[in-house]
UniProtKB/Swiss-Prot annotation:
Species for this entry: Mus musculus (Mouse)
Underlying gene: Ccbe1
Membrane-crossing residue ranges in chain numbering: none
Every Collagen-like domain range: 247-292, 302-335
SUPFAM superfamilies per record: EGF/Laminin
Compartments (UniProt record): Secreted
GO biological process per UniProt: endothelial cell migration; lung development; lymph vessel development; lymphangiogenesis; lymphatic endothelial cell migration; positive regulation of angiogenesis; positive regulation of endothelial cell migration; positive regulation of lymphangiogenesis
Protein name per the record: Collagen and calcium-binding EGF domain-containing protein 1
Record lineage: Eukaryota, Metazoa, Chordata, Craniata, Vertebrata
Amino acid sequence: MVPPPLPSRGGAAKRQLGKSLGPLLLLLALGHTWTYREEPEDRDREVCSENKITTTKYPCLKSSGELTTCFRKKCCKGYKFVLGQCIPEDYDICAQAPCEQQCTDNFGRVLCTCYPGYRYDRERHQKRERPYCLDIDECATSNTTLCAHICINTMGSYHCECREGYILEDDGRTCTRGDKYPNDTGHEEKSENEVKAGTCCATCKEFSQMKQTVLQLKQKMALLPNNAAELGKYVNGDKVLASNAYLPGPPGLPGGQGPPGSPGPKGSPGFPGMPGPPGQPGPRGSMGPMGPSPDLSHIKQGRRGPVGPPGAPGRHGSKGERGAPGPPGSPGPPGSFDFLLLVLADIRNDIAELQEKVFGHRTHSSAEDFPLPQEFSSYPETLDFGSGDDYSRRTEARDPEAPRNFYP
């Protein structure tokens, strides 16, 4: 008998790979089936909305591995998504001059840049604040290395000037000692030729400003497209019309704050916010009506169980009302004065001891012998009996010669 072959690591790896690729192959197969089934219907019912956005659906897997349907929005055929809207693919996105200075079509995205001499402020651009192309102060950033004497900053550029007694060289930076107009007859910084009729003159400062302006225009024209016909096009809905559009000039100084505009239309309601913290509990409501008694006929009642142990004693309650008097009891035996006489004898002895301690001897009291009632005078042993039953026995036992003393 040939033993079965041992499972190899390669076989286990293949089984593990088959388990992991199983859901993926199932998704691909269902995706092809879905596409084959839904594609004709999607083509028939795909309608491009006014905003040129269409919605497509496709099969996808949830995190639990369950197959579901996902939706995706895209621009209609022949349109591309730029700046939050769908525009025609052949439309020049820079035709409406969306940028403050320079605009570049970066694969369907608007890329705004600034002219030389300006810096781009991203934060102001994101807040839609203008101008966001800010002038660079070359005189402040150059640390007085641009000009030999005086540096004057201008919008997008700068120019140099010399102190009195110096002239500016052709490079526009260097200053040389000397007089620029040695044969000057009275007018300052004018042309050496005499001004004639039909001619005009300008100072060196005015000429330098015009030169700087021409230089800026050359830089702007170098950035324009070669086809001048494309400069005057702009988009209006789905139609591309032609107009006499011009390049925007350099931004002017910000004006004063205008009057507040009229309030805009009411916006759509936003998304519901997060639930707030729970409030304080309200007062307790009144008790509702009693419900119907439950039907306990189907419940089987067993025998009563044994009595449990006594519980802990409760608190003492209030004193109850006085009960009704009970029936009178049977009469007791006759009383005796023996106990009272014993108490009086103890008091007499205590008084005698107190007198002995205070006076040093006992004082004789005139009332030392207590008088007896007359009905007891004929009975010398009256104080010895307790009741009538034992009187005869006590008198017989006492010695007749003993002294008669009423106190023990």
